[in-house]
């Protein structure tokens, strides 16, 4: 085979160079005696050189060192998430899975379901809004005009569909937790609360007002912690002249009423 020099160069940079860089990263981690992190990086085929270099991704993987993801499908899911999400969003998803599972253990919930919902909760977050809208309309997921107008809101509903169709998730409890993780709803289950709350307090979250107070409350009461979290969301949204979805407003009112009646 007569290959030109340019062909060889292109093959090197397209095929061999990424492998070499990835191998270098693994070797570097081993040299730094971060054996656990090296194993974590190698255990997920979808984590390429760029992701392995990302500090947030490394931090998220470090959370999973002592207790890896339990679902046997997790490596495949992680590979799909790595390919479809931005690095920060990917790291956030791993961190929410860790946090959801932890809170589930604390509050006597199903840790596997919590992990699954936490891992997949943002699986549609990086889709373009017009694609989210197309999926929502084509599959009759919602006719709420306020949801349809905002990717920040719509990705949860579409994410539940994507989790079922693309990731093979069939558990209705998990799919429901994904559907409502960003708005909540009156009467939501404790698993729903666990995932919704974990989304806002996972370890990689940048500091915001009352974050540490919410984290502390989450150790003893999902309801009180979620109420404080949603009230903070309401303050943040309204202070910027933006729209707070009625479902969130109703969830806040429901939590206040429930906590008052429980006294």
Language model regions located:
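Short alpha-helical hairpin
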Residues: 62-77, 128-133
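Short, positively charged and aromatic/hydrophobic N-terminal segments
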Residues: 25-28
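Long, amphipathic alpha-helical surface segments
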Residues: 225-237
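N-terminal secretory targeting signals
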Residues: 34, 38-58
